[in-house]
Amino acid sequence: MSLNEVSLRIPTEHMANVFGQFDANIKKIERTLGVTVIVRDDQIKIIGNESATNGAAEVFNQLHELSKRGNVIAEQNVNYALALLQEHKGSQMVEIDKDIICHTINGKPVKPKTIGQKDYVDNIRKKMVVFGMGPAGTGKTYLAMAMAITAFKNEEVSRIILTRPAIEAGEKLGFLPGDLQSKVDPYLRPLYDALYQIMGAESFQKNMEKGLIEVAPLAYMRGRTLDNAFIILDEAQNTTPAQMKMFLTRIGFGSKAVITGDATQKDLAPGAKSGLDVALRVLKNIEDIGICELTSKDVVRHPLVQRIVQAYDDYEKKQSNKTNRKNVRAGRKNDGRQK
């Protein structure tokens, strides 16, 4: 088989970032695509079969473009560039990076990092109600918070309302010590963390005192109509069908709602229906409601977290298949007995 060669230039100021510590990114690309990469000065030569060398060149070009845009190239960037290459979507990586939602208090840009996240953010921009489902680390809550804060700063809404069911792991608010705020704070900590990072603690506290930002358990939404607000319901998998219906019918004029959850992390009583599951079935065909499914491909935490999520996904699929096969066999036995 004849070997193909592709040459390209990576300027010296970007080489360390693109190649990684001890050339870790080069080695990853070589292993994954089965190519050999030779670096001389600012030139790199890629040797292998035609498809692999062209693919490797595309990955290096995408990483170079990200580096030029000020990104620190991490292992997850390389992994995602290689994954997009397999899906023939490599060119979308830089386009995703251009979508800056806002900046943190330290000036760091907040933006989607995967195709799934970009679709989620675009849905929030276009739709009145958006469901964002996915495992931990997919950015579903953080991106929703960034969109809420941006809408608030741009005066598209007059307030932000953050809520989640506050009954988890068998703990009821009435049995916990302290006032309401101290009772619900532990449950709402992930929302506070995002607010502090993007808005800053001082600005957050001022807006809380003015009533422009409200953080409360879901039960406190009952009987209200929420106009001109950006409302986020987090941990929606732990709602009951009645709670979910109550929440959705609170949405008023000029408001936007984002519902986030992970169907695999329910803390409901055994056998209890999840309001999130029911809502997705009931509302799937309604216009102006967006439903976004984020997966292990959208995990943007440490690469090990992505592998853990994928391993659990694979395990749960195998268990589900085993259960289905058992049910089929049991059904056949019952049919035989009836005959």
Can you name each region flagged by the protein language model?
Residues 38-97:
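Interdomain "pre-motor" coupling segment immediately N-terminal to P-loop NTPase/helicase cores
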Residues 1, 18-19, 39, 320:
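A positional/architectural concept
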Residues 87-108, 112-115:
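Conserved loop-to-helix interface motifs that mediate assembly, gating, or partner/ligand docking
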Residues 1-17:
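Short glycine-/aliphatic-rich beta-strand segments at the starts of folded cytosolic domains
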Residues 18, 25, 55-59, 244-247:
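Hydrophobic side chains in well-ordered alpha-helices
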Residues 31-38:
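A short, structured beta-strand/loop element
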Residues 14-31:
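Short amphipathic alpha-helix segments
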